[in-house]
């Protein structure tokens, strides 16, 4: 049951309750292709409550489910994650297997959830958002109890 929640695009909810107010959020995307340890972004673009997306291009490069995809994906620096939490973002989204690799993956997901920010992994089709200045993200999680991950559908609404 626990592994089912971590297939495809999903939230790492870490047994927390996903607030209904998070279903629709303002979105902001950062093009971080080619960066292995993502440290610097324009934090001024981020507002409290935003769904912050990192487009690494790694899903297309490595292919979902490959060994490389799960073990060698780009990651956010711990310092950047702290800054995102200080900005009180609602959701951190990325187009790879996580915001941290290896043994740091699960503890960082828990840390974010404990700070009311959820991580959405394995996002797809992000390149279509790169030219958008403003957009809204709607997130539709499947409802299961006692799971650390929830499969979800993430849809961007652009003007």
Where are these regions (language model features)?
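Active-/binding-site microenvironments in catalytic and ligand-binding cores
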Residues: 1-159
């Amino acid at each position: 049951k626990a592994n089912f929640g971590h297939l495809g695009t999903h939230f790492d909810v870490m047994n927390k309750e996903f607030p209904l107010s998070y279903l629709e959020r303002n979105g902001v995307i950062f093009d971080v292709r080619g960066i292995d340890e993502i440290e610097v972004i324009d934090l001024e673009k981020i507002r409290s409550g935003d769904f912050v997306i990192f487009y690494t291009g790694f899903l297309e490069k490595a292919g979902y489910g490959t060994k490389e995809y799960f073990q060698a994906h780009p990651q956010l620096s711990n310092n950047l994650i702290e800054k995102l939490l200080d900005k009180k973002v609602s959701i951190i989204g990325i187009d790879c297997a996580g915001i941290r690799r290896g043994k740091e993956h699960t503890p960082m997901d828990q840390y974010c959830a404990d700070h009311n920010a959820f991580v959405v992994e394995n996002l797809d089709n992000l390149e279509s958002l790169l030219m958008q200045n403003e957009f809204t993200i709607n997130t539709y999680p499947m409802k299961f109890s006692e799971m650390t991950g929830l499969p979800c559908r993430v849809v961007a609404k652009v003007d």
